Amino acid sequence: MTHPSTLPDARPSSDRFRCGGRERDFLAATPPHSPAPIPALAGPDAAGAKANPSVISLKYPLWITASLGLLAVTQTAKAADPVDAKFVRTYFATHCVRCHGEKKQSGHLRLDTLAFNFADQTIGEQWGEVLTQVNGGDMPPKKEQSRPSAVENAGVVEWIATELKKGETARMAARGPVSHFRLSRNEYGNIVHDLLGVRFDVDQPGLFNEDTRWRGFENIGSVLTLSPSHIEKYFNAAEAVVSIAVPEKVAPPAITRQNATKLAGGAKNRLVERSGQVRHLAFMGSARRIYSNGVNGNEVKVRAQVSALVPAGGAAPRLTFYADNQPQPIFDREILSPEDKPIVVEFDAAVVEITMRVHGTSRLDQKNPQPFDDEGKPKEPLLLIDWIETEAPYVTEEGKKKRESLVPVDPENAAEVRKTLHRFTERAWRRPVTDAEIADYVKLIESEKKAGESFRSAYRAALTAILASRNFIFIQEGAAKERRERINDWELASRLSFFLWGSMPDDELSTAARAGELRKPEVLRKQFARLLADPKSGRFTKAFPRQWLQLQNVGMFPPDKKLYPEYDRHLEASMIQETTDFFAEVFRENLPIREFLTSDWTMMNRRLATHYGMSAEGQDFVRVKLRPEDHRGGLLTQAAILTLTSDGTRHRPINRGVWIAEVMLGATIPPPPPNVEPLNLTRPDAGKSTLRMQLDAHATTASCLACHSKIDPLGFAFEAYDAIGRWRAVDRPSNFREPVGNAKEPQFPVNASGVLTDGRKFDGAEEFKRLMVEDLDRFAETLVKNLATFALRRAMTFDDEAEIKKIAAASRSDQYRLRTVLANLVTSDLFQKR
């Protein structure tokens, strides 16, 4: 991995880039006042972002109390003899090593060789697990005849907690003075839009490397490293967006309209006269490129006048547009308007190429279609297109204002040039900039002008260098010349805006930071409320649930077309949108977070309603009241969650159990032990038993029981839902190879019952969800932990657990309403720590 000092602002003078058609030296483009070298792992506590297989907490999340005053020690007695490392080692040898020693390591934890180096993050995590188990009375096991006394346990707990606190202090002291976090792809695109008024497609193939994810999160500093391939791509991207925002000459938009005849492309069977007008006839399989030769970042406005012919009892056709051969559409809508009342649909996008497709039928002959019967009625869903119009380049009024503010009105006024450049750089770098830093960019402009470039070309070179700087690409916290544990006002402004907007602070937030006012509680609360009310908070309501719930995995294993013919991209997109819109509704209405576990409503469009066996009008997502017989409510019974925990062929109870344990309960699930025989779903007798039956038999093995008893029940609660989230009353053999309804295979009653490790029983998803609600405090702490991970861009460790519990506890009196939880997080000490 190349050191980030090789970014353009730190290149030696021999390194050159091409800009504006010729080579340019960027050494002078960047001030010498660059931050301290960026570590190979860009975020603090890099070790905290690595899964530690030696540490497990299968039953509950790892809640560690880091303060002696908060220890939940039930015993008040003190150890008679002073407790030290020797005492603890003897304690382990007497009570623990039989199960956690050389011959046996239950839970992948070995204590006879556990080091006493509490400053080490990994070792500290293991000691934290020991503290949790001893303090909770779970270890040593109650069945052991020779158990330690309450006095011994209290002494060991107090000693471990003290040493853990010392270890935390040592790690803080050892942390570097500066932390850097690379922008994610989506954040880069958001900033470019907010700063330059350019909508840049960061997902375009070949533009940027895909961001490495850690447990679903895409913004974790320790895994968003900088490779050599990134550097050139960042420069090219900066040059591209600046050339669009500050062109040599602003070109007027060109409007191109394709009428029905042109759309038909000479194919007479694609033209039809309906309602006195010649129209282009489109049906399933119809595909046409309607826009090409665009430039990434230049927006195009697309308008189309369309109507539909829907057969009696049939579905409506869907008009879909795809960009740059991407699998997900940029526009997808059912067309319901009759032929005598066509509608105009429109959208805008920043893409290079747009292809139109129509979905709705698959039974017409593509070469010689006969779409109408003898009475002129449609046999299949058909789309009538009167015309399609494109307008490019398309710039919104807001975008025009942003772009106009980038360039000084009077290029000959040196003071105005410096002032405009200073404001842009301060906004781009999200911190105060010095006159010396700006002077280097002014010199670059003058150098370019002397070389014969126009002012706008020279100015573009300066803006490009600013955006190619690591000061832009990395979020910096801390300072090389001072060692501090808390972030300053400017860093707090960035942390808040990236958390809620996925982008840079705006002028009002920066003004509060510049005045040194933002860390004042009343100012911070006011700014927090303002950011929530801004439409840009919609980025948070999409990004956080997508990453927290790992919705990127929906469609990773596309369902078998033979087994699930109804599954398509439209359904997949609807599944994901149900979940993100559900989160957004809880956010918007400030509902209690128990709604995530169980609710009497969901968000739904007609496509998803059909999938659920329900009814809903229209293609837009709306809030729908649920009935008990709908078998829905909360996140866990949404199709997106049920699908991402399946494998494309069948549902996977173990996958579902692991997902619930890790995502909803914050537990750490260890890998399966070596040499475990996998289930054979194709063995001769597989047709006589369900997957549940085979798992029950598998879990009776002694080596499997310990883990499966904690994982499997969580997944068994959702046995009544198949691999694509449909509810079912009967189960199927584990080796099924035909779609639902195959009369030849035997049927079995669904068994969705289970017993949790604490002895509580349930039968079905609804009873299980009620048990989850009983443990609402635990879920609240897990949610806070995930929110903090997203906000602070790093993995939470046991050093953070006391603060996480404090944030959750402060939200309890308001029923854990989501905005209350967010407010308590933002105003917490944790949020302002480096």
Q: PLM features: residue spans?
A:
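Conserved structured core elements
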Residues: 86, 90, 124, 128, ...
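Sequence context surrounding c-type heme c attachment/ligation sites in exported
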Residues: 74, 79-129, 136-150, 609, ...
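Short polybasic linear motifs
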Residues: 46-49, 388
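Bacterial N-terminal signal peptides
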Residues: 61-72
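Extended surface/linker regions that mediate inter-domain or inter-protein docking
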Residues: 159, 179, 187, 191-196, ...
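Aromatic- and Gly/Pro-enriched helix-to-coil junctions and flexible linker segments
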Residues: 77-256, 362-409, 426-443, 447, ...
